[in-house]
Swiss-Prot record:
Region: Disordered, residue numbers: 158-244, 289-312
Zn-finger region bounds: C4-type: 28-51
Organism: Arabidopsis thaliana
Function: GTPase-activating protein (GAP) for ADP ribosylation factor (ARF).
InterPro entries registered for this protein in UniProt: ARFGAP/RecO, ArfGAP_dom, ArfGAP_dom_sf
Annotated ranges, domain Arf-GAP: 13-131
UniProt feature, compositional bias: Basic and acidic residues: 158-169, 210-222
Protein name: Probable ADP-ribosylation factor GTPase-activating protein AGD8
Length: 413
């Protein structure tokens, strides 16, 4: 019987069938339209679809609207509708000065609406708490599965342990968590339950059976020996490894001797080798490309001083370079004079003729100009051909369009 009544409270079809059987719930609370299919969970009232849209615009913090046919309802929401109803809400709002007419927004944002919402919420919470407590007290499962408590310790019967073999003992020690875990009871202590048994004491019980001796003969698990790395004391292995491969240039080795020799006598490079030469470019193989200067050339050459020029130009007011250096530029003057005499009877002289350059550049210039002319002529021909093609295409498209339009007109007529 209790289960059937609980199902009736959680089944929305049964709840709404009972609520809509009342005459005041057969019309909309705000506009009195017949057969409302929506409801405001916040106030427990029935609404039509138009008024439900207005409530939805107010926001869910003011009015939470749901469909009585399409939406799903929780038990708390159904209880709110059962505690509410159009008749109770109408009486409450009239007592606080609100009639059926008026603006919906002002009505549901007023102090009266807030007070009515709080009253419904308190009644629903109180009913749910009472049903929860009564369900725990009347539940046969909760009372039958609670263990008997004596002096704060549950009186679970201590079973006599069977003798274990060595194999079972080792398996039990390998999984102590599985054997020692106790599942706590999830049931709460019923209200008004009395403690049974004697009071006082810590609840310790004396063992009636003697523990088996084979439990103390269990051997602890042997830890697998860790395989050590290559020992530094093994001279034979270190010699073979040193002789088989050289150490890395950036590897740190503790067994290297101070002279750079390994144990096997093999030459091993140090961590950072000193440079073989002081030159920076010698490490990259670039030292050979630069000729080395002698020590005599590296120092500045000493200019031999003489008193010849000083004695020669003591009383001179000005000195020219030709007078100072003598006949060093006479050969150049003779060559230029000979070149000018070569073109004495010519009307014009080019730079190529004067300096003796080849005349192949003129042929190159002529070829380039000819190439430019040919390219421009070819471009003009291509442009004219493109213009002709565009004109022909335009004519073809025009004839095709006129044919299509004429065909469409013939079909329409």
């Amino acid at each position: 019987m209790a289960s059937s009544s609980a199902d009736n409270l959680t089944d929305k079809n049964i709840v709404f069938r009972k609520l809509k059987s009342k005459s005041e719930n057969k019309v909309c609370f705000d506009c009195s339209a017949k057969n409302p299919t929506w409801a405001s969970v916040t106030y427990g009232i029935f609404l039509c679809i138009d008024c439900s849209a207005t409530h939805r615009n107010l926001g869910v913090h003011i009015s939470f609207v749901r469909s009585t046919n399409l939406d799903s309802w929780s038990p708390e929401q159904l209880r709110t509708m059962m505690f509410g109803g159009n008749n109770r809400a109408q009486v409450f709002f009239k007592q606080h000065g609100w009639t059926d007419g008026g603006k919906i927004e002002a009505k549901y944002t007023s102090r009266a609406a807030d007070l009515y919402r709080q009253i419904l919420a308190k009644e629903v919470a109180k009913a749910i708490a009472e049903e929860t407590n009564s369900g725990l007290l009347s539940s046969p499962v909760a009372t039958s599965q609670l263990p008997e408590v004596s002096n704060g310790v549950s009186s679970y019967s201590v079973k006599e342990e069977l003798p274990l073999s060595k194999h079972e003992a080792t398996s039990a020690t390998s999984s102590p968590k599985a054997s020692n875990t106790v599942v706590p009871s999830t049931f709460k202590k019923p209200i008004g339950a009395k403690r049974t048994g004697k009071t006082g004491g810590l609840g310790a019980r004396k063992l009636t059976t003697k523990p088996k001796d084979n439990l103390y003969e269990q051997k602890p698990e042997e830890v697998a020996p860790v395989i050590p790395a290559v020992s530094s004391t093994n001279n034979g292995e270190s010699k073979s490894s040193a002789g088989s491969s050289f150490a890395s240039r950036f590897e740190y080795n503790d067994d290297l001797q101070s002279g750079g020799q390994s144990v096997g006598g093999t030459q091993v490079l140090n961590h950072v080798a000193p440079p073989k030469s002081s030159s920076f470019f010698s490490d990259f193989g670039m030292d050979s490309s630069f000729p080395k200067k002698s020590s005599s050339n590296s120092s500045k050459s000493q200019v031999e001083e003489s008193d010849e020029a000083r004695k020669k130009f003591t009383n001179a007011k000005s000195i020219s370079s030709a007078q100072y250096f003598g006949d060093q530029n006479k050969n150049a003057d003779l060559e230029s004079k000979a070149t000018l005499q070569k073109f004495a009877g010519s009307a014009s002289i080019s730079s190529a003729d004067f300096y003796g350059h080849d005349q192949d550049d003129s042929n190159i210039d002529i070829t380039a100009s000819d190439l430019i002319n040919r390219l421009s002529f070819q471009a003009q021909q291509d442009l004219s051909s493109l213009v002709n093609i565009a004109g022909e295409t335009k004519k073809k498209l025009g004839t095709l369009a006129s044919g299509i339009f004429s065909d469409i007109q013939d079909r329409m007529l």
